[in-house]
Amino acid sequence: MKKYKLSKKGNQLINMYNKMIDEGYFKVKAEENLSYVNFEIRPLRKNIKKIFKDYNIKSVLDYGSGGSDWNKSGFDVETEKSAKQYFELDKINKFDPAMNVDERCLSDCVVCFDVLEHIFISDVRNLLLDIFQYAN
């Protein structure tokens, strides 16, 4: 698979996110928060579960995965299942360059939450081409 290339500014942005991951960051009111801790897919889980079932999705590439832990129990508060169990998936792969995680491979579905708004406009085309090449 072809690897996309970011612009100089895009690479600087990834480096900034690396620093945020390592050191955390401060909000306006000086509340310290660790970055990359939300599982952005959770609020949409019921709709996504239906889509995954309708299209027989068994493998997912989480593009820009951040702190998403697909194997951690409690993803669904009603069943206490992990995201992998809840969606009945066989395989999860992750990609997050800011966290030095690169498990990109062909998958039944590529999910991408809270990513594109952080990409420089000049890098969007190459990033989308990269995402599409991993969707089965």
Report the location of each language-model feature:
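Conserved N-terminal segment of class I S-adenosyl-L-methionine
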Residues: 1-107, 125
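A short, conserved alpha-helix within the catalytic core of class I
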Residues: 119-135
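Short, flexible loop segments at the rims of nucleotide/cofactor-binding pockets, characterized by
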Residues: 37-40, 115-119
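A structural motif
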Residues: 57, 135-136
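A conserved beta-strand element that flanks and buttresses the S-adenosyl-L-methionine
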Residues: 111
